Amino acid sequence: DLHYPLRRQRQMCIRDSNVTVRFKDVPFLYLPWMNFSFGGQRKTGFLAPILGNTARSGAEVSVPFYWNIAPNYDATITPRYMSKRGLMLGNEFRYMEQTLGGQLMFDILPDDLITDETRYGVAFNHNQWLGNGWGGSLHYERVSDSNYFRDLANSVAFTSRTNLPQQATASYFGALGRDGSLNFNILVQKFQTLQDPLATIISPFKRLPQLTLNATKRNVYGLDFDLASNWTHFSHPTLQDGFRLALYPSVSIPLQNSWGFIKPRIGVHHTRYDLNAPTGTEAKTANRTLPILSLDSGLMFERDVNLWQGKYVQTLEPRMFYVYIPFEQQNNLPNFDSAEMDFSFAQIFSERRFSGEDRINDANEITLAVTSRLIESATGNERIRAAVGQKIRLTERRLTLISPQTTAAGADFIAELSGRITPHILTDAGVQLDQNNFLTEKIRAGISYHPQPGKVLNIGYRFSRDVFEQVDISTQWPLTKKWQALASTNYSLKDDKLLAGLLGVEYNACCWSLRLVANRFTTATQKTSTTFFVQLELNDLMSIGINPIRALQQGIPGYTRTNIQ
């Protein structure tokens, strides 16, 4: 009976020996000695055991041991036995000082019963403030093999990982006189690439190192000056690599008041390459210099309206953006880090179509757009936002990542609608059209009904031409006063298969709850994994079993723990 101790003061400590924990008068846990606090203070000792079952590892049990080393240091050591794979040891160490902090995790399976190999995973994060504007960080991850997460992790957040970063940074941020700032960053970076045998990928370039310098200076005789620059040594075992210097100085004239703005801008993007020679050839040097001109402008109109028995402010925000960049053939340049950016409402007001520095798109384009928002007068909260935009190509696009493809003059159209239609219904929708070819490029549509905590229904649809077409449905719904249904599905209409699914029930009896959940997700091409979660949670005391909360929150947006008062 947990009611009596849980109603006592939160600082109450319990110390006892030969303790038997009973649930419904059934003894299920014997503790030769027990010492813990309801107030949440950290104490050294064993935590509640974790029980579970997965398709790839079999039945498993973990018994974490928590070591409260000092107020700013602690460690958790977790023996984890898996019936199909053997005994694994997990270790987590955390530390914090006034100017630094970090976390080290190291898991090892000395002799996997299936692969007959030692499996391990390590992750180290460290952040430090060095003073006078300087800071540094270290992030290192490595696993023993490409199947480590697919075989031993219980979450799609891990099994979907491909490139594990191994990097160190040092950065400086400071003022540049009055109304100015300066940011300098040093990055050394490489990755461990986890390969899927049925869909191998090329590993990213190493940056050994990358130096970045960005500076801004505002209101210099009415002008704003910006500088974006970086110098990078790219290294790769199989692809041509070398050095790249990128400079983009620009100057703009910001003219702005309460009802509108106009901002002309001119800049010059210069890139220099010093490339290493492939076998049997000479080293290569290349340069590219392109001017970039843009004009951004917009107006703001407002009016008071009465809707749904409430007072609102409705805005009308027309905006026009023009950009011009001349064409230059760039097939002779390497592509270290450029990729085409997703077409979105924010991106249509960008000068650049490609990320990175290796491809600078040609452009002679006008963007016309209008946004309207409905804002609650009393709170200032945005209730509904609607936006439409059209990017008009005055000349054909000649530069693409896939040469020699070109895009004719024409227009792209985008529309978005989002907001809280009623106090309990949220919606988010968008569509992108290629008006040249009368094709629908992308669609997203979603609606969420959330009338109260513990009661939510989400329905979503996503489409990208020639890439994917998917439906997402998820819910947390009460069946009775104490029982709740839990379900989610991510289904590919294009491939006619289930990509991820979750099904379970939750029972809440005020001071304890029980969760039974099955979670299936894709781990690799044509491979899936199923994890079964069984958790008994005794409120403020302990929980036994594999915790499914993270999987439920990922699979069911808006999921609420109903046993938290």
Question: Model-found features: residue ranges?
Answer:
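Short, exposed "boundary/linker" segments that immediately precede the start
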Residues: 1-2
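Outer-membrane beta-barrel proteins and related beta-barrel translocases across Gram-negative bacteria
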Residues: 8-11, 15, 19-565
